[in-house]
């Protein structure tokens, strides 16, 4: 990276809590919420940012980006299976012991403690996981619940690179359909 002296580099507030939503709103800056690992506060943070936003020299209106986990496969079952890699990554972060991305498993409950399994379930509850039709329904529901989101950022920990690429292509199809229907 190079210093951006005399460049107009936009400043964003990146956050995963309501505190960051308050800061972004008060400063009149774009806000990026880390819903991929902090979904519990996402709804409240989005609401706070939009309701308390103060126009600034940077922005006249709020600009909201949300990052979500996304795994889109041919079937819901295949997507759920592939998403077990993502769940393992989340648990690894929580344990404080990052490890290489692990292959998906048919027995997630068998490799996690009951507490870790519940944590993974909670952290994945706002994720876009499923077939294209399922993810489209989830995304439309998300947009209806949260109103205007300016950008969606997706993260996808899929073990197999070809499956990951296919997942991103399917997600692109879904987003195109959702955008065309609005």
What are these language model-derived features?
Residues 154-162:
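Small/polar glycine-rich anion-binding or flexible loop at a beta-alpha turn
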Residues 1-27:
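Internal, glycine-rich beta/alpha segment that forms the wall or movable "lid"
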Residues 44-52, 162-181:
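C-terminal helical cap(s) of enzyme catalytic domains, especially alpha/beta-barrels
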